[in-house]
A protein has these predicted regions:
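Active-site core segments that coordinate phosphate-bearing ligands/cofactors
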Residues: 1-160, 165-190
Length: 190
């Protein structure tokens, strides 16, 4: 069903405007901060839903567009997402110490939570570092949901990526794979 061929052994990671990770379980499990949804044949889908998907990357894009408009009279480019990702790809994993908690609109558990960038230094105060740190922060958020699920779902041998946020941003897919320590499968139609 959906993007996951082997639901009993897979972890689905879907990044669109928001994002979620999901895993099929054989019974209902209450884990604070996670949701259970019905799944065919008497199973359940355990969901970690974040408000930090592609919309978070769009907020950073908006900042860069405002800088362009306000400082450079709007000489901007149409491929700014690609430029951001290209710059982020030149930055080493860990963003030279810059960290992002991408909770611009809170979380499902704490709607008042807000985003932050920490570890700023003269060396990492660049557009590429901000873009990379934000993508790494998104991956970290999904990974934390996975940690919450782990006692119930056990190890999952397959990680499946879905949604435009993963399909169109291969750097994000690579960062997710690195954070989860497993290859991320990207189905053609997911």
């Amino acid at each position: 069903i959906g993007s996951v061929r082997e639901p009993a052994t897979s972890l689905g990671i879907n990044v669109g405007t928001g994002g979620q990770i999901s895993a099929r379980t054989d019974e209902f499990h209450f884990i604070p901060g996670l949701e259970n949804r019905p799944f065919p044949e008497g199973h359940y889908l355990l969901i970690g839903g974040g408000l930090f998907g592609g919309r978070s990357y769009a907020y950073l894009l908006s900042v860069f567009q405002q800088v362009d408009a306000q400082l450079f009279d709007g000489a901007g480019r149409d491929d700014l997402y690609d430029r951001m990702t290209g710059l982020a790809a030149t930055i080493p994993a860990g963003s030279d110490g810059l960290r992002c908690a991408p909770f611009f609109t809170g979380s499902r558990v704490d709607p008042g939570l807000r985003a932050s960038f920490t570890g700023l230094s003269p060396d990492n105060f660049t557009p590429g570092h901000f873009a990379r740190a934000l993508l790494e922060g998104m991956a970290e958020g999904f990974y934390r949901f996975g940690e919450q699920m782990a006692p119930v779902i056990g190890p999952r041998t397959t990680h499946v990526g879905a949604g435009n946020g993963v399909r169109r941003n291969r750097l994000l897919a690579a960062i997710l794979a690195a954070r989860f320590g497993a290859p991320l499968r990207l189905p053609a139609l997911a």
